[in-house]
């Protein structure tokens, strides 16, 4: 920034992610400021989070009345399993939902873009398809940004 911008110029980072939930870009900028080699103001512009886009596109609520929703990473889901009946998972390179057959999944990739992909259904029925779509999309584009909501299927519906 110091080498690219003049004293009266403005720079910006357009970052794909959810700065209110998870975004290391803000932490990096804070670290640069902390070092004191350059001074600048940081403004995070609010937008639509991937979680809001996911639930809107699937036409489901994020929460259920009187029930908690847990937001976690794929790594934590793999380590601890689901800790609530509703779990939002981000950053899951390993499809940690596999085997959670008592959950319905609402999965989305590239949410809000022309390349958006949506799949929903019981994990036991759509899990393999999600893995295939995810692998194909990642190979085609070179990257993937996906998010999903797991919702426990009531025992009476099994």
Positions of the model-derived regions?
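A contiguous loop/helix-start segment that scaffolds small-molecule binding in enzyme catalytic cores
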Residues: 80-158
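Class I SAM-dependent methyltransferase SAM-binding "motif I" and its flanking Rossmann-like core
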Residues: 17-85, 139-142
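Sparse, context-dependent recognition of short Cys/His-centered cofactor- or disulfide-binding micro-motifs
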Residues: 6, 56, 133
């Amino acid at each position: 920034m110091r080498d690219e911008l003049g004293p009266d110029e403005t720079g910006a980072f357009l970052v794909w992610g959810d700065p209110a939930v998870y975004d290391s870009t803000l932490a990096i900028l804070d670290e640069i400021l902390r070092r004191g080699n350059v001074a600048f103001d940081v403004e995070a512009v609010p937008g639509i989070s991937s979680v809001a886009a996911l639930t809107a596109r699937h036409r489901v609520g994020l929460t259920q009345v009187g029930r908690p929703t847990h937001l976690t990473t794929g790594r934590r889901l793999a380590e601890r399993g689901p800790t609530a009946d509703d779990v939002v998972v981000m950053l899951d390179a390993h499809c940690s939902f596999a085997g959670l057959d008592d959950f319905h999944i609402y999965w989305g990739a590239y949410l809000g873009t022309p390349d958006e992909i949506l799949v929903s259904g019981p994990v036991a029925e759509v899990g393999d398809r999600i893995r295939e779509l995810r692998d194909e999309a990642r190979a085609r584009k070179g990257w993937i940004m996906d998010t999903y909501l797991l919702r426990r299927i009531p025992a009476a519906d099994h």
